Amino acid sequence: MPHNIEAEQQLLGALIRNNDLIEKCNNTRLNGEHFYNKFHGEIYDKINKSLSSGKTANIIFLKTFFENDEEFDIDQYFEQLVINAAPGPAIEEYSSLIYDLALRRELIYTTEYLQFSSFDLSQDDITANDIIEETENKLFQ
C-alpha cells in the first residue's frame, strides 16, 4: 500500500516542535484517518484537538494520552519525532503527500471492492448498476 512513514514522523515532530504549523496541515484537509500508521493518526488527532481547544501540544502534554509498555518507550518515540522533525516550510508538502497517499490507498480499496463485487454472482438482488452506484459513493465521499 502507498505510504511514507518518514513523512508522517517528520510532520508530527514539526507540529510538536511548532504548534503554529497546524494551519498548513489544515489547508490540505489532513486528519488522523489519512495516516497509514494508526498510532501516528492518533497522535495527529490529539495534536489537532488540543490546538483547536486553545491548548498546546508538546511532548509532556501528549505523552499523558499514550502508555508505555515493555516493548515501546513513548518518551523516547516522541523525542525522536521532535529530533527528526521536518523543517517548517516542508510541512504543507508533507501534509499534501500524506493526504495523497491516503487517497491512493482508498482508490485501491475501492477498486478491490469493485472487482470482488463484480465477480460475486451469489447475490441475485445486486445488479451491476448497484455495484456502480456503490463504487461512485465510495469514490465521491
Residue ranges, per PLM feature:
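Interdomain "pre-motor" coupling segment immediately N-terminal to P-loop NTPase/helicase cores
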Residues: V82-Q141
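Noncatalytic partner-interaction/assembly domains of nucleic-acid and motor enzyme complexes
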Residues: M1-L103
